[in-house]
Amino acid sequence: MAVSAGSARTSPSSDKVQKDKAELISGPRQDSRIGKLLGFEWTDLSSWRRLVTLLNRPTDPASLAVFRFLFGFLMVLDIPQERGLSSLDRKYLDGLDVCRFPLLDALRPLPLDWMYLVYTIMFLGALGMMLGLCYRISCVLFLLPYWYVFLLDKTSWNNHSYLYGLLAFQLTFMDANHYWSVDGLLNAHRRNAHVPLWNYAVLRGQIFIVYFIAGVKKLDADWVEGYSMEYLSRHWLFSPFKLLLSEELTSLLVVHWGGLLLDLSAGFLLFFDVSRSIGLFFVSYFHCMNSQLFSIGMFSYVMLASSPLFCSPEWPRKLVSYCPRRLQQLLPLKAAPQPSVSCVYKRSRGKSGQKPGLRHQLGAAFTLLYLLEQLFLPYSHFLTQGYNNWTNGLYGYSWDMMVHSRSHQHVKITYRDGRTGELGYLNPGVFTQSRRWKDHADMLKQYATCLSRLLPKYNVTEPQIYFDIWVSINDRFQQRIFDPRVDIVQAAWSPFQRTSWVQPLLMDLSPWRAKLQEIKSSLDNHTEVVFIADFPGLHLENFVSEDLGNTSIQLLQGEVTVELVAEQKNQTLREGEKMQLPAGEYHKVYTTSPSPSCYMYVYVNTTELALEQDLAYLQELKEKVENGSETGPLPPELQPLLEGEVKGGPEPTPLVQTFLRRQQRLQEIERRRNTPFHERFFRFLLRKLYVFRRSFLMTCISLRNLILGRPSLEQLAQEVTYANLRPFEAVGELNPSNTDSSHSNPPESNPDPVHSEF
C-alpha cells in the first residue's frame, strides 16, 4: 500500500535539495528561545491573519498519516469486539421485549438485518480510513454509523468510546490522506503533499486535554486519599513496587499519586522536545499496564498510537531512511513533501507571501472553537443538571476516568397495580441487557417508563414502579441513591433541571472510612461486615438467611428501632449498642434520629464455615492416605478421593462430590497458571479468531437476507449454529468464560451473601 512511484524516488542528494526548498517555502526557521521551545513566535499570535498563517503553516504529513493508518486499523479491530458486531444478534434480536436507553427516546434500533448493514458500513469506513481510500467518504461512512450506535445505548458509554468518535470527527476534516494512502497513489496532487499545522494542533490538543483534564479530575479528595482504586494494587503488575512498599503504600503512592502526576504532566512532557522522551516512556508504560489491568478494548493502543503525534512530523521518513534500500521501495516515501493548496506559505526570496484564503480561516476557526468546546464540556454540568447524580454530568465526556468505584449491595424493584393496589417485586434488571441503569436517574426514568409499557402484558394495569437501590461509592457506607417512596413512572425528570428524587451522597460520613477499615481488619477470616447509612424517616426491610447463624446489628451513629417481624418485637438501639438477629426471619430497621443513622451487620456464614472444615478434613485424609500415615482402608464412598473422579461403585456423598469439583477447579487453575506463554497467546488468538469469524458469518447471513430474502427458519437456525461453532478450539477450552469476549454485560455476582435483600 506504499504510496511510491518510480519517479517519486530520489537520491539522497536530491532529497536534501527538496528539503532545503521546502524549508525555504515554509519560511525562516525559529531561532529565538521561544521559537525553539514552542515552535512559533509570540508575533505569530499578534493578529488574526498571523494566527491563521501559523495554523496553516505547511507541515510534513508523514506522522499524521501513520496515526490515520493505526487509528483506522484499531477501529477495524474494535468494531467486532467492543462495538459488539460479534454479539449483535443477541442485543438487537427482532421481537425482544427489551428496555433500551438511547440518548433521545426517539432513537430506535433498526431491524436486526439492517443493523448488520449499519455495522458493515462502519467497518468499511474504518477500513477505507486506514488505507486512505476515498478518504473523506470513508471517514463519513465510519463516523455516522458510529455515532448512531453510540447514541443508541447510553449503557455502553465511556470515555474511550467517546474519544474514538471525536478523533474520527477530527480526521474527517484533515488531509490525513496526503501520505501513505491509496488516494495518494491515484492522485499526484495529494501524494506526499504538505498538510496545515492545525491538523496536528487539533489532535495534539485533544490528547493533551484527555490527559490534563483527567489529572484535574483526579485532584478529587477520594483519589488523593487513595479510595478510588483501593484494590488495584493487588494485581500482579504491581509486584515490583511491592518489593519496596507495602500494598497500602503501593495503592496510595503508585496507583493514586502516580496516576495523578502522570495525567497532569503527560501532555506537557510530550509537548516539549527536551522532555518528550521521558513522556513517551511513562505514557507507554502506563498504557501497557492499563491494557492488562482493565477491559478497555482498543483505548490503550489508540493512546499509544497518538503519542508519536507529538514528535517531529517527519519521523516516519527518518525511520524509512534507516531501512535497507530494497525494502524502501515497499515503504512510504522519504522524499520531501510537495506544496499543497491547504497551506499558507510565507514569502521566500524576491516573492511576496501568500494571503490566507477562506478555507485557511475556516481551518483556524475550527481549531480554536473545537478546542474551546472540549475545554468547556467537562465542566458544563451546570447546564445538564438532570444527568447529575452523585457524580456530575453525562458519563463519558468528562474524562473523570477511574475516579469513582461503586459496589451495589441491594437492588429491589417494587410494582403496584394502579387499580387493585396489588404489590409485587421484579427481578432486578428484568427486560434489560445492562446493569448501568442503577446509578443514573435518566436511565432509571427510561427503565420505569419501559416497565410501565411492558407490565400490562402480565396483567398489571397502570403500574407504579419504585426502586430501592443501595450503593457504596469509593468505600463509603452503603446508602440509598434514589428515594424509594417515589413512583418513578410519574416522577418528573428533565435534562436541564436537578432531579428531586435523587438522594444526596452523605459526604459528612466520609471520615468514617478510616474507622470502617479498622473494623474490617479486626475481624477474622470467617466474619463479614456490611456498613449501612440511612436517612431519617426511612426503613430497611431485610431477611437473614438460615445459613447466617451468627448475625448481629450494631449502631455506629444516630438512633434506630429494630422490628422483629415474626416475634412482633421492637428494640431501640443507640450509639454503640447491638443486638442479635434471628436467622431465617425478616426484620425492619427504622431510622428514628433526626440525622442519618449508621449501623453495621456482622455475620458468620456458619454453613459455609462448616463446609470449609469438612473439606479441610477430606483434604487431610487424602494426604494421609497418599503418604502412608493412614493405614486403614477408606470406605467405598470415599474412594473417589484417591482416584480424583467417580468410577462406578457407590454414589459418593454430596460432600465428596463438592470436594472433587473443588480439586478439579484448583488443578485447572494451576494448569493455566503454568501454561507456557506461547500456549496462552495461541489460546488468546483463537478466542479473537472466533469473534471475527462469527462477526463475518453473521454479517453475511444478514446481508443475504436483505438482498435475497430470508430463508426458512430451519435453514437460519443451521446457519447460526454453524456461526457459533468454535472449530479452532479444543473441547477443553470451551467454558463459559470463553463464550464471547465482546459481550459488554457479563452476569453480576452477588458481592455479599447477607442474602437476597442484603
Swiss-Prot record:
Single biological process term from Gene Ontology: negative regulation of bone development
Annotated EC: 4.1.1.90
Lumenal side: 82-113, 158-292, 383-758
A GO cellular-component term linked to this record: endoplasmic reticulum membrane
Disordered: annotated span: 1-22, 732-758
Membrane topology of this protein: Multi-pass membrane protein
EC supergroup of this enzyme: lyase
Keywords linked to the UniProt accession: Acetylation, Disease variant, Disulfide bond, Endoplasmic reticulum, Glycoprotein, Lyase, Membrane, Transmembrane, Transmembrane helix
Outcome, altering residue 394 to R: In VKCFD1; affects glutamate binding
Entries under InterPro entries matching the protein: HTTM-like, HTTM_dom, RmlC-like_jellyroll, RmlC_Cupin_sf, VKG_COase, VKGC_lumenal_dom
Active site (catalytic residues): 218
Reaction(s) catalysed (UniProt annotation): 4-carboxy-L-glutamyl-[protein] + 2,3-epoxyphylloquinone + H2O + H(+) = phylloquinol + L-glutamyl-[protein] + CO2 + O2
SMART domains, per the entry: HTTM (SM00752)
One Gene Ontology term of the molecular function aspect: gamma-glutamyl carboxylase activity
Entry-annotated residues carrying N-acetylalanine: 2
Spans within the Cytoplasmic topological domain: 2-60, 135-136, 314-361
Assigned protein family: Belongs to the vitamin K-dependent gamma-carboxylase family.
This protein's name: Vitamin K-dependent gamma-carboxylase
Organism: Homo sapiens
